[in-house]
């Protein structure tokens, strides 16, 4: 039996989970069709998902149709959970991108499709909610060709709420024959030579084009009224093909971790090659760690079943492997989809329990949530001692707050959400602290040179010190100290886009230790950073704004107020497309404003595009290291020189 892994993707509220539930029901995997409104869906299994009607975590289920086993991964539709969606992309053989017939192409729709297109993932577009009043399919078709791709093939026509095929294995319209010829040279040559080409030949060529992500079939339906679901199942089993297995050696990728109500850790793996068997002893990440598979499940027709073996391209579930982390692999390192640029959160908030004595409980709960979702980053501010969480947005914050209260029985308060800035040195500087020169209490001399690098370059560390003079353990201690120092600059933000060179060293044998070098490094780094000064960097968003032409003047005025950099404007009689960059801090709510002043027609699509020097006169009241007496003494001694 062929096995495929299919992602269900959509902008929030396009009907993604409802379509998934209908696929389960129509294929016989469930006895009734779950409804989001009723809170009885299979894929949204978390209480908070059922109650709020949104998908928070990617969930996996399975159906069988036309002899094909299809593992369905239902992904979040909200931008705040984009990291969860990105992890899903790595394991997909194909995708169904769902559009709402009434709302059409929305910001998340375009972002998802551009990623699918970039990664060359075979994709079926499904227009949902065709039953709604006011649907204008012809206008939507134009929008799809304008904003998604010209390479779409509309497989059906819609008449009075029902769908009818216009392209199949036995029948194809003449204009569709031309479409196929324009996309395939072999068919074109046969067509020009007047060779006989059957509908099946065209159909098989379409399948091959879809598999190569060169053509995107478009289908229609309504999950609410079970319209077009069987046709969608047929398309999935026809157009989405399993990958060819390249090896019999085990290779498995861990893409999801969850904990059941009893606290058991459940790990979900995609078997890339080979097979995983009960009682196998397998290596994790090519390390010296081995685990024994003591239990093994897979997903079959919407439910989990115990098995002795899970084969290539299928999903395996194992329990109570404490060493597992998302992104780990078993056996050979898997070849996964490349080209994803991980989006780091650009917002943060301090969180504290309503009862101060429950702080350790909050930390433990957050650690469990981090195991399930590695994009959840939290830390303890070493100066304020506050617990800080990095966030993608307000909805994620609300979900975390609810999970802490309902799942871990601890109530917390979040402070105001703030933008995460970064710091970069302004100029090249060199700083040295000498051994046995007060107030240096460490048996070490360290010299560091700091110099700014281009934006986006990150941290680079080099050493001018010979390992013949100062061995690896001492130099590694300096490198650790540099990385630790970069976590908090003059204003408390991460220091980035700089090169740090270890330029001078002296030690006394046998009294000097790596710890001396590790502990002195932050003081040298700090003094050098103070001498250089820092630029404050703010997160930027690359945006595409599509609006009716009548709203273009307002849009340009708005973008100027948001301190954006407009890079391109193109307009026709009806629409304007504007591209550029805008600070995250000024544009957090602009998508909803666009929807308001364009009556839902406008799209403001953004994606992170690095940092730039802030333009808004950033200032704060943070004074780091005020209680560090040794730093004060270093500063005083340096000022006397």
From Swiss-Prot:
For the biological process aspect of GO, one term held by this record is:
response to antibiotic
Please state every residue range assigned to the domain named tr-type G: 1-244
Q: Report the Gene3D superfamilies cross-referenced here.
A: 3.30.230.10, 3.30.70.240, Elongation Factor G (Translational Gtpase), domain 3 (3.30.70.870), P-loop containing nucleotide triphosphate hydrolases (3.40.50.300), Translation factors (2.40.30.10)
CDD domains xrefs: Tet_C, Tet_II, Tet_III, Tet_like_IV, TetM_like
Q: Which UniProt keywords apply?
A: Antibiotic resistance, GTP-binding, Nucleotide-binding, Protein biosynthesis
> What are the binding positions for GTP in this chain?
10-17, 74-78, 128-131
MF (Gene Ontology): GTP binding; GTPase activity
PROSITE patterns documented for this protein? G_TR_1, G_TR_2
Taken from the record, one Pfam family name reads EFG_IV
Classification via InterPro entries: EFG_II (IPR041095), EFG_III/V (IPR035647), EFG_V-like (IPR000640), G_TR_CS (IPR031157), P-loop_NTPase (IPR027417), Ribosomal_Su5_D2-typ_SF (IPR020568), Ribsml_uS5_D2-typ_fold_subgr (IPR014721), Small_GTP-bd (IPR005225)
The UniProt function text for this chain reads: Abolishes the inhibitory effect of tetracyclin on protein synthesis by a non-covalent modification of the ribosomes.
What family does the Swiss-Prot or TrEMBL record give for this protein?
Answer: Belongs to the TRAFAC class translation factor GTPase superfamily. Classic translation factor GTPase family. TetM/TetO subfamily.
Q: What is this protein called?
A: Tetracycline resistance protein TetQ
Taxonomic placement: Bacteria, Pseudomonadati, Bacteroidota, Bacteroidia, Bacteroidales
């Amino acid at each position: 039996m062929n096995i495929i892994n299919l992602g269900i993707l959509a902008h929030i509220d396009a009907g993604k989970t409802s379509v998934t539930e209908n696929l389960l029901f129509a294929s016989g995997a469930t006895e009734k069709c779950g409804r989001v409104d009723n809170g009885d869906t299979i894929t949204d299994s978390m209480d908070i998902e059922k109650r709020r009607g949104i998908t928070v975590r990617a969930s996996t289920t399975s159906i069988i149709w036309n002899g094909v086993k299809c593992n369905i991964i239902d992904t979040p539709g909200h931008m705040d959970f984009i990291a969860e969606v990105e992890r899903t992309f790595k394991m997909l053989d194909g995708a169904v991108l769902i559009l709402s017939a009434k709302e059409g192409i929305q910001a998340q729709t375009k972002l998802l499709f551009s990623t699918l297109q970039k990664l060359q993932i075979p994709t079926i577009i499904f227009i949902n909610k065709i039953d709604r009043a006011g649907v204008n399919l012809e206008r939507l078709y134009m929008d799809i060709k304008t904003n998604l791709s010209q390479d779409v093939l509309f497989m059906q026509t819609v008449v009075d709420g029902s769908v009818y095929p216009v392209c199949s294995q036995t029948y194809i319209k003449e204009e569709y024959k031309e479409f196929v010829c324009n996309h395939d040279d072999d068919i074109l040559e046969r067509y020009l030579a007047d060779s006989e080409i059957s509908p099946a030949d065209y159909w098989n060529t379409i399948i091959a084009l879809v598999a190569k992500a060169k053509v995107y079939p478009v289908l229609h339906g309504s999950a609410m009224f079970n319209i077009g679901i069987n046709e969608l199942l047929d398309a999935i089993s026809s157009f989405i093909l399993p990958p060819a297995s390249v090896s019999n050696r085990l290779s498995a990728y861990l893409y999801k971790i969850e904990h059941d109500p009893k606290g058991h850790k459940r790990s979900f793996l995609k078997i890339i090659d080979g097979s995983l068997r009960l009682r196998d002893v397998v290596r994790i990440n090519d390390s010296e760690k081995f685990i024994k598979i003591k239990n093994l499940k897979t997903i079959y027709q919407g439910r989990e079943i115990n098995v002795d073996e899970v084969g290539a391209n299928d999903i395996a579930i194992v329990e109570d492997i404490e060493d597992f982390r998302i992104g780990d692999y078993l056996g050979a390192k898997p070849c996964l989809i490349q080209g994803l640029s991980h989006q780091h959160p650009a917002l943060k908030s301090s969180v504290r329990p309503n009862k101060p004595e429950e702080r350790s409980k909050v930390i433990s709960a957050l650690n469990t949530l981090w195991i399930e979702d590695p994009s959840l980053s939290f830390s303890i501010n070493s100066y304020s001692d506050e617990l800080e969480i990095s966030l993608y947005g307000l909805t994620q914050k609300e979900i975390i707050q609810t999970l802490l209260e309902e799942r871990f029985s601890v109530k917390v308060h979040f402070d105001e959400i703030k933008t995460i800035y970064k710091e970069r040195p302004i100029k090249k500087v060199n700083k040295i602290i000498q051994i046995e020169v007060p107030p240096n209490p460490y048996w070490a001399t360290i010299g560091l040179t700091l110099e700014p690098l281009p934006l986006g370059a990150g941290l680079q560390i080099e050493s001018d010190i010979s390992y013949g003079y100062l061995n690896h353990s001492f130099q590694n201690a300096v490198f650790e100290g540099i990385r630790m120092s970069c976590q908090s600059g003059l204003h408390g933000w991460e220091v980035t886009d700089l090169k740090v060179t270890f330029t001078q060293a002296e030690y006394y044998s046998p009294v000097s230790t790596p710890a001396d070098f590790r502990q002195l490094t932050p003081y040298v780094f700090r003094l050098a950073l103070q001498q250089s000064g820092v630029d404050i960097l703010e997160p930027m968003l690359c945006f595409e704004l599509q609006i009716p032409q009548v709203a273009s003047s307002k849009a340009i005025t708005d973008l100027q107020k948001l301190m954006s950099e407009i890079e391109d404007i193109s307009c026709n009689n009806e629409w304007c497309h504007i591209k550029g960059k805008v600070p995250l801090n000024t544009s957090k709510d602009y998508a909803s404003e666009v929807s308001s002043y364009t009556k839902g027609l406008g799209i403001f699509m953004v994606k992170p595009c690095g940092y730039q020097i802030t333009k808004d006169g950033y200032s704060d009241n943070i004074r780091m290291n005020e209680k560090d007496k040794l730093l004060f003494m270093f500063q005083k001694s340096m000022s006397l020189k």
